[in-house]
């Protein structure tokens, strides 16, 4: 079962729909309507942190959940969720030089885990005004996708089953979004079984 922390974003249910189409069981909880103990009781196989209209500091239980469950269950963050992952581990989330709302970018990726078997570069849809500052990304992370300008578009933890994407895989304008989600689940389901 996947627990989706909903950061009050309209895109959350697009993610939920994609994951449902992949045959996954989902529980969705708003970021202010669940506690760490309640998450423990649900015993999810995966934790996903949704996009949202705010900063990581305003994302309810998202930061605490990432801290608590890092290394216990696979975690995937989208947009705000991605920024929250970086911040938990010591990265700085700052105002982007260019606001990206409903704009697409070609991103180059490393072809591993979530990007395995996907076209390179691929088109990613962006809706954000904040971004992870590249020089502050902790050394425990690898940048797995970026724009030609060097903006971080995806990260992967080097040792733990944690990944984040700055763009929106659930947007119809993003290439291979559903495949990325499938790749995440298939890659890290092994971690759940182990």
Swiss-Prot record:
InterPro entries: Anth_synth/Amidotransfase, Class_I_gatase-like, GATASE, TrpG/PapA_dom
GO biological-process terms attached to the record: folic acid biosynthetic process; L-tryptophan biosynthetic process; tetrahydrofolate biosynthetic process
SUPFAM superfamilies the UniProt entry points to: Class I glutamine amidotransferase-like
Active site: 79, 168, 170
GO molecular function ontology, one term from the record: 4-amino-4-deoxychorismate synthase activity
Catalytic activity: chorismate + L-glutamine = anthranilate + pyruvate + L-glutamate + H(+); chorismate + L-glutamine = 4-amino-4-deoxychorismate + L-glutamate
Presence of keyword Lyase: yes
The protein's name in its UniProt record: Aminodeoxychorismate/anthranilate synthase component 2
């Amino acid at each position: 079962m996947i627990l989706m922390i909903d950061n009050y974003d309209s895109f959350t249910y697009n993610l939920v729909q994609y994951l449902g189409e992949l045959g996954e069981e989902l529980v969705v909880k708003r970021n202010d309507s669940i506690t760490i103990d309640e998450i423990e009781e649900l015993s999810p196989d995966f934790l996903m942190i949704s996009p949202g209209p705010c900063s990581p500091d305003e994302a309810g239980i998202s930061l605490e959940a990432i801290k608590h469950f890092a290394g216990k269950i696979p975690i995937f963050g989208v947009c705000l969720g991605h920024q929250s992952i970086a911040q938990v581990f010591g990265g700085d989330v700052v105002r982007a030089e260019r606001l990206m709302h409903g704009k697409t970018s070609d991103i180059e990726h490393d072809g591993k885990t979530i990007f395995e078997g996907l076209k390179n570069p691929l088109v990613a849809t962006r809706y954000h005004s904040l971004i992870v500052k590249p020089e502050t990304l902790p050394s425990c992370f690898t940048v797995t996708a970026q724009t030609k300008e060097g903006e971080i578009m995806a990260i992967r933890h080097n040792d733990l089953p944690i990944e984040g994407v700055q763009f929106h895989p659930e947007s119809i304008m993003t290439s291979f979004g559903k495949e990325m989600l499938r790749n995440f689940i298939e890659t890290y389901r092994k971690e759940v079984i182990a």
